[in-house]
Amino acid sequence: MQAITRRLVLGAALVASSFGVLAQNKVILGVAIPSADHGFTGGIVWWANEAKKELEKKYPDLKVIVKTAKDAGEQANQLQDLVTANKINALVIFPQESAALTKPVEQVHSKGVYVTVVDRGLTDDSGQDAYVAGDNTAFGRIPAEYIAKALGGKGDIVAMRGIATTLDNERMDAFTAVLKNYPDIHLLDAKYANWNRDDAFKTMQDYLTRFKHIDAVWAADDDMAVGVLKAIDQAKRTDIKLVFGGAGAKGMIKTLRDGTDPRIQANVSYSPKFIYDAIKMTAEARLKGEKLPPKSIVPSVLITKDNAKDFYFPDSPF
């Protein structure tokens, strides 16, 4: 991840503003992110505040204002406050929802604020200057390929979806595209569980009631995988041989590394640290009067027991 970050920051430094503007005297950078309502967003909040602390110490002409929101409505209101009360001239936003935040972000952008969107893309990208995200296509493709191979190309599976966002669509589209190559693998259902372990627990209970045989579960998130496993254990179902989460939460990676649950055989990387990278890249570019590349993607890779030690960070909040 450090090497990836260095490459992204170097790329940002090389992309000068097409308008040739001089460096700004003062950058007031607003950061709008979801509240820490599950493990991944907990990591997002932690890394955002780490960026604020480190960058404000390093750059006296930079002020970073971090706002967390419990839903799309609150986040939209915070954007108004950041513009009118805090007078921001740059924004890094991890949208609560894609569609609901597209217009509010466009309104901020129309006032001359430089906008970097992170992870959950907008439905219309004309209101942004840059986009930084993990590789959502690989995040969906890698689990599908692993599950298909593990099942020998045939079996019954169920899936979880997150929140209705562009990134969730990208992941699901990539997952189902792989399955088209395996006509004997049947995707029984794929419901939204909001990247939440309690919602995933309830969704999995529904699946277990409706489907008498399931070979594997694509939980699509490590928090949701925890809820899935709890539901399976409570139902005492032994038919499910594989539960594939995602994002590399330390608890799940430890289980994978130690081999303590045979259903946890693999994972896919997707670190919340990219919010730190996005804030750092945006702040440093704007202090120089420069722009970021229009799109920066952090690769996702397959994590197995063989390389799990490289993705296990015991001091991380996620």
Please give the residue ranges for each predicted region.
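N-terminal export leaders
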Residues: 6-10
